[in-house]
């Protein structure tokens, strides 16, 4: 093989290698042809796929975190929570990636800075938001923090029920909900502090009255 042939082969190999996409662990690929048609079969982790004709879209499918922040739900005492933040962790069934991408509204998905598509990210965010507002109505504002674990479980159950109602429970698995912050409104905290202060003041006065009564009884006994 002469020098020019070797160079041509080397260039060809380099071009072939550069025109490939490897599907990493925790993600699934879907091929998009040069005419933008999406193939319905998934490309699984570990596979290396050529992209000389068309390209390969990659979708993270495992433990995707959706941050649902700055919520202001209404509590059972009709007070508005000043700030409620949580995270929803979900995974996509690898065998459902192509179907969800093709059939669901593109507004349900989100794009990462790296160019990956987070399937159903915006949809899960909305379900989480709705669930948080619904569950918050079961608790008094000042008691939410003490019931954080219970609220997390209840919000997750609401999301799972919503997915089941849309027949998506076999395609999307919500594994966890984490409540990051529950901040009652300032006026509710101030009222609670004022109440505690008033109760403490009342107890102090009761002690003073009881002490004075005992002292009077002692003096009366000495003078008897």
What feature does the model see in each segment?
Residues 21-131:
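Hydrophobic membrane-anchoring helix/hairpin
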Residues 16-19:
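C-terminal motif of bacterial Sec signal peptides marking the signal peptidase cleavage site
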Residues 9-14:
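Hydrophobic helical h-region of N-terminal Sec-dependent signal peptides
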Residues 1-8:
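Bacterial N-terminal signal peptides that target proteins for export
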Residues 25, 29-30, 88, 146-158, ...:
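Short, well-ordered alpha-helical segments
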Residues 78, 83, 115-188:
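Amphipathic, coiled-coil-like alpha-helical scaffolding segments used for oligomerization/assembly
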Residues 187-224:
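Long, charge-rich amphipathic alpha-helical coiled-coil "stalk/tentacle" segments
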